[in-house]
UniProtKB/Swiss-Prot annotation:
One of its GO terms (biological process) is arginyl-tRNA aminoacylation. This is Arginine--tRNA ligase. The keyword Metal-binding does not apply. Keywords: Aminoacyl-tRNA synthetase, ATP-binding, Cytoplasm, Ligase, Nucleotide-binding, Protein biosynthesis. Its EC number is 6.1.1.19. It catalyses: tRNA(Arg) + L-arginine + ATP = L-arginyl-tRNA(Arg) + AMP + diphosphate. InterPro entries: aa-tRNA-synth_I_CS (IPR001412), Arg-tRNA-ligase (IPR001278), Arg-tRNA-synth_N (IPR005148), Arg-tRNA-synth_N_sf (IPR036695), ArgRS_core (IPR035684), DALR_anticod-bd (IPR008909), Rossmann-like_a/b/a_fold (IPR014729), tRNAsynth_Ia_anticodon-bd (IPR009080). It comes from Yersinia pestis bv. Antiqua (strain Nepal516).
Amino acid sequence: MNIQALLSDKVSQALIAAGAPADCEAQVRQSAKAQFGDYQANGVMAVAKKLGMQPRQLAERVVELLDLTGIASKIEIAGPGFINIFLDRQWVAEKVEYALTAPKLGVAPVEPQTIVVDYSAPNVAKQMHVGHLRSTIIGDAAVRTLAFLGHNVIRANHVGDWGTQFGMLIAYLEKMQNENASDMGLSDLELFYQQAKKTYDEDEEFSLRARAYVVKLQSGDEYCRQMWRKLVDITMAQNQVAYDRLNVTLTKDDVMGESLYNAMLPEIVADLKAKGLAVESEGATVVYLDEYKNKDGEPMGVIIQKKDGGYLYTTTDIACAKYRYETLGADRILYYIDSRQHQHLMQAWTIVRKAGYVPESVPLEHHMFGMMLGKDGKPFKTRSGGTVKLSDLLDEAVERAGKLIAEKNPDMPADELKQVINAVGIGAVKYADLSKSRTTDYIFDWDNMLALDGNTAPYMQYAYTRVVSVFRRAGVDETSLTLPLVVTEDREATLATRLLQFEEIITTVAREGTPHVMCSYLYDLAGLFSSFYEHCQILNAESEEIRQSRLKLAMLTAKTLKQGLDTLGIQTVERM
């Protein structure tokens, strides 16, 4: 359940009864310190100013009218008019009982929306590199979160599968008499790409043939289309290996490459001209946007068709948004693309809105992210200055985790050891990224991400194993916990209340696309459990009622940690 929403509703009703306008905001927040209660309502000051009242006087009136019977044990006014709410422990205990047995930990069902999430987007005929990591894992965390809440999520992998480079690649494959492209690994294609580019730059006859193949490919020539399809299939098969290793939910069925929108592009250019939005300028077709100015202070021109008839990324992105609304029926469209593309997207979407392709009621959201940097504060590279391949990064993560885990578990069976090492290594890379605000750059540091303390995947995975080990030692499962839950100690109350805030957290992540909020919550939860575990006897509690009650708190902690980590795509293990 969403306690914040419940209290906001109750406080808003009291504010309105006290004379506040119907659109007043209660501003209910989780309290930062225990002395200020579990929640604070901070909206009184703003409302008092509108009403010309003393905030304290309005706060007193609101508290008189505030009906939190059975929910709060105490309501206090602090400072100029803050309202501190202390939850009733019996009420908290009942809600924990409900969360333990309810579907989805008691998180309320949402009104399902169709939400398209654009993420990952690697290029064909190139291996995935570290630059693809953030979009892939942040986007997948958003997808998992939205799906958990009950939304209809459409994963859109906007693969770079079109352009002049394909003429070059097809021509080079032919030159090498290598028409059986399906037998080639992606590493061969990487080399082919480099050699094809070199030949294209140096051999005029070859470059003419490559350009001819581009025209043939675009006009539907069967041989060229078959070769192009092979290049796409080989690339995506290799990318699927990376997705599976990363525990990412993307599959080949989610590929919606640039080529998907080819047929729409001429229609869009014609339509934008017909609507008076696009004009001819020096042979090209341009949309001038008053919302953006060039260096001379004039409306910026956005080219949607070059004078040679070619289309641009902007044209494709306009078609893409239109397709996602009209064909996929999107209620909301999210783009996990790095921050450097922000102006490009905003310009495309401005045209989309002006043309009426996607109504204002359907949000187009750029959930941008910063760069992954090395310890030197520069873009993360190999020692020789090259781009780090994603597969190499994951190999190193597993290798480093292997040394850490094998050393601590010399007697663990080989199969289990391999699974734990993989979960910890891959989890460490993902969590290090997801635990940072996506809008900022972050420093990639092996030592920090594999540490067994602090806000890291290994610590979180270990925290989970510590909780489940309680049940192994107790020799009980959920069905044997039949006595009611009671909350008497402060540490029990703090842990129980934090457990009940899971819905507030996951709702925030779903709304804002901020997985670091979930990471912070889970880290806090693990710390609260550790304090509870150290100060409140569980297995040796003074009575069977308290023993079972504390086991129930431990059970919900385990379930919440596991579910929270799952929304991030981080695997848990039963022991480390």
